[in-house]
Amino acid sequence: MKNLFLLIMLACFTFSVNAQDDKATDNFSKWQARFRVISVMPSAGDDIDGADVDISTAYVPELDFTYFFNKNVAVELILATTKHDVDLDIDGGGTADLGHVWLLPPTLNLQYHFYADDFKPYVGAGINYTLFYGVDEGDVVDMDYENSLGFSLQAGVDYNLNDKWFLNLDIKQLFLSTDVDVDTGEGVLPVEVDINPLIIGLGVGMKF
């Protein structure tokens, strides 16, 4: 998946060199909104010896708003919330149920858009602040997740259906981690968990 993300970013830069469309860039809207269905696929890592944290994939709707400073440079605010089941896979066999947690990760990306006829690829990078809420503790006494600041990379493409509506394919990689305190009933275990989700979305957008 990460190789696919890098290939799309490379393709976007190729478009910028070989396929800039002056006519397209003369007609742009200051605001865009997209509605996507996204797949959020965590790539979990932790600092626990003898066990690995497993975080489930989530499929949810997502809404974003984009404002263009000029024909190429824009800023995008991404809004979505996801629920993930959390397990602890113990080396040698066995799994501990750590319940579930909801993530609210508003993300702000600075984007650069290219133009190639009806195709408009783009790349972006920005910041993310993830809020953890709605925690279910599963088999342990308590789970406490610390809200965290992270970073994001993005690549995607819009395809114009007409002057107002367009289709969108978007891939984002978020780099985020959280400190978790796990109360087992016999003591509190501090754990640093890397979540680092890959997010793939497909949807429709509107210019206004």
Task: Give each language-model segment a name.
Residues 84-89, 162-208:
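Predominantly the C-terminal beta-signal and adjacent terminal strand-loop region
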Residues 106-108, 125-129, 146-157, 171-173:
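Hydrophobic alpha-helical segments of small multi-pass membrane proteins
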